[in-house]
A protein has these predicted regions:
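Positively charged, aromatic-enriched patches within helix-turn-helix-type DNA-binding elements
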Residues: 18, 23-95
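Flexible, glycine-biased helix-capping/connector loops in cytosolic signal-transduction modules
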Residues: 1-3, 15, 29
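Basic, amphipathic DNA-recognition helix from helix-turn-helix-like DNA-binding domains
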Residues: 1-6, 78
Length: 101
């Protein structure tokens, strides 16, 4: 697997678990980082909220479906050039989310 991944101004350094945007460090919550990495690993695939809850939060967690939405919104705020009009983390109506970076 690659040591880093770049989309737009965002660079994810997997070895350091570090995310930068235009050269500035972006502070992600641990679960936001895990979610971002999972989206990158599965780029181009539409992932349901239930699938993301299972894979990113794990079997033991009992978060609500809104948990995924809140974390996606957090990633968009921190990483998207225009969070209200996402370019990289897309909502696929009634199916889930897709990363296209």
């Amino acid at each position: 697997s690659p040591a880093a991944y770049q989309f737009g101004e965002v660079r994810v350094d997997f070895r350091r678990a570090e995310v930068t945007r235009a050269g500035q460090t972006v502070e992600l919550l641990p679960r936001e980082y895990k979610l971002l990495c999972y989206l990158i690993e599965n780029r181009g695939a539409t992932l349901s909220r239930d699938h993301l809850l299972d894979k990113v939060w794990g079997y033991d967690a009992t978060p609500t479906t809104r948990t995924v939405d809140v974390h996606i919104a957090g990633l968009r705020q921190k990483l998207e050039p225009a969070p209200r009009h996402p370019r990289y983390i897309l909502t696929i109506h009634s199916l889930g989310y897709k990363f296209v970076g």
